[in-house]
């Protein structure tokens, strides 16, 4: 009886060790560092941040008082519109919204956190940038966190993204297509499908710095063949290339 119990104990220990080895990345539970909210504000319409002005949200939570869904919304469903040259900083976007933040020209998004991503967190709608994201983070995006519809350059620095589809996607089938460039630095990415997606046939590039960490992210840089006909763009390759500029492997977070 003692011998049988010993065998069972050894088998259980071996199984536990195997599970620990094969799923070691699950051993450290990631906690999304959402800041504490200092109050809540519900808008009846998008809050407009005029060009070349700064709105400091004071780390309050901002929403629209609607159910968070993946349905395609419009500009009128955004929480904030940031006009050309405007800055949104120190804000939490609540789960009671659909479209998050829309940049209607060059913008700076600094220390902005999304409690939940519904359609997209941040949509870059007009102009050629620069579009600058500094700090902040987002979680729970079934698809895209940052959607880039216009042209130009995007910088994403120090952002935290957790449980996501894509951190950044250059629109693959907009009516009007542009060349787009994104630089990703200091980003913490955990449990996602794709870090960045670009259309290399339009001259897009993604530069991913060595201080980016990724844990349980399936694809770091995915290339597509974009189009302006509305068709679903096919994947054309992934990994380091002349369009996807980075070195593998990225460090784990």
Curated annotation (Swiss-Prot):
Q: Which UniProt keywords apply?
A: Calcium, Carbohydrate metabolism, Cell wall biogenesis/degradation, Glycoprotein, Lyase, Polysaccharide degradation, Secreted, Signal
Where does the record say this protein resides? Secreted
Cross-referenced Pfam families: Pectate_lyase (PF03211)
Question: What glycosylation sites does the entry record?
Answer: 52, 227
Question: Reaction catalysed?
Answer: Eliminative cleavage of (1->4)-alpha-D-galacturonan to give oligosaccharides with 4-deoxy-alpha-D-galact-4-enuronosyl groups at their non-reducing ends
Note describing how the cofactor binds = Binds 1 Ca(2+) ion per subunit.
Give the Enzyme Commission number.
4.2.2.2
Q: Tell me which Gene Ontology terms the entry assigns under biological process.
A: cell wall organization; pectin catabolic process
Cofactors, names only:
Ca(2+)
Tell me which domain of life the UniProt entry assigns to the organism this sequence originates from: Eukaryota
Write down any Gene Ontology CC term: extracellular region
What task does this protein carry out? Pectinolytic enzyme consist of four classes of enzymes: pectin lyase, polygalacturonase, pectin methylesterase and rhamnogalacturonase. Among pectinolytic enzymes, pectin lyase is the most important in depolymerization of pectin, since it cleaves internal glycosidic bonds of highly methylated pectins. Favors pectate, the anion, over pectin, the methyl ester.
Q: Which protein, by its recorded name, is this?
A: Probable pectate lyase D
